[in-house]
Regions:
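A composition-driven surface/loop motif
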Residues: 1-196
């Protein structure tokens, strides 16, 4: 395994505004992103097409331009997202294209705040399908949304969602939307052993 640790405090001090997670050929990569409770930099994260491995968020706060995903996963990725401590995505969610897999684990909490006309929390936009979404975490996922139309976990056109554990809270204000599933398409949902 190949491990990297990234400090948000150091990145912000050096005026970086993005983290680009690169794939490593032939090996599973592990990236640790470390923040600090209360520290809120304007930094976004993108994951290169074809990445396979684990990304650990430890007391991380990410934000950027409103309406752009705070974590943008590329095509044909298999990402194990481990949540530790208190984490927040302040201006956008996690984009998972239909060719990728996201598995959420860990005992930390993740809060996603969305404030845009059209929005999604974890999944993909209203005119796209999302990839496979697996939730095996023990911690909480809290999604707060203000907008005209959107989705908490899922996408506009649908996909596969497997929720096996965890605590979930949704506070979604707007004209049209869904907490879990799809807005305009079909979703395959498996939900058990969780608290909503």
């Amino acid at each position: 395994d190949y491990n990297d640790t990234v400090s948000l405090v150091q990145l912000a001090a050096n005026k970086y505004t993005s983290i680009k997670v690169k794939k490593a050929r032939g090996i599973n990569k592990k990236i640790i992103i470390k923040g600090s409770v209360g520290f809120q930099p304007n930094i976004l994260m993108s994951v290169e097409d074809g990445f396979r491995g684990t990304i650990i968020l430890e007391n991380v706060s990410l934000a950027g331009e409103r309406g752009i995903p705070c974590i943008d996963i590329g095509k044909k990725c298999n990402v194990n997202l481990q949540i530790a401590g208190e984490n927040e995505l302040r201006t956008g969610g996690i984009r998972v294209p239909d060719s990728s897999v996201l598995t959420v684990v860990g005992d930390g909490n993740l809060t996603i705040n969305l404030n845009s006309g059209k929005y999604f929390g974890i999944g993909n936009s209203l005119d796209e399908y999302h990839g496979e979404l697996n939730f095996y975490q023990d911690g909480g996922i809290i999604i707060n949304a203000n907008g005209m139309k959107g989705i908490g976990i899922g996408s506009g056109l649908g996909g596969f969602i497997n929720i096996k554990r965890g605590h979930y809270e949704f506070d979604m204000k707007g004209q049209e939307g869904a907490c879990i599933g799809s807005v305009n398409g079909d979703s395959e949902l498996l939900i058990e052993y969780c608290d909503m």
